[in-house]
Amino acid sequence: MKVTLIAILTCAAVLVLHTTAAEELEAESQLMEVGMPDTELAAVDEERLFECSVSCEIEKEGNKDCKKKKCRGGWKCKFNMCVKV
């Protein structure tokens, strides 16, 4: 009885992990297939640079210390600009 229960729980755990991994791979493959043209990627890069520097400029005008805006998705704020990590 215990062996059967352990086997069922193990299979369920493996199934959940496999399903999660498969969904991640499918999402990555869709991103790779669809992709964005270089011009759109450049626009996204410019937006990230703009967002980070404008955030710091606004905070400086209020006589407050400039707090770096958190950049997401593999980007970080450095010298008031989002840079790819």
UniProtKB/Swiss-Prot annotation:
The keyword Heme does not apply. Keywords: Disulfide bond, Neurotoxin, Postsynaptic neurotoxin, Secreted, Signal, Toxin. GO terms for molecular function: toxin activity. Disulfide bonds join 52-66, 56-77, 71-82. SUPFAM superfamilies: omega toxin-like. Residues 23-48 form a propeptide. Belongs to the neurotoxin 12 (Hwtx-2) family. 02 (Hwtx-2) subfamily. This is U4-theraphotoxin-Hhn1k.
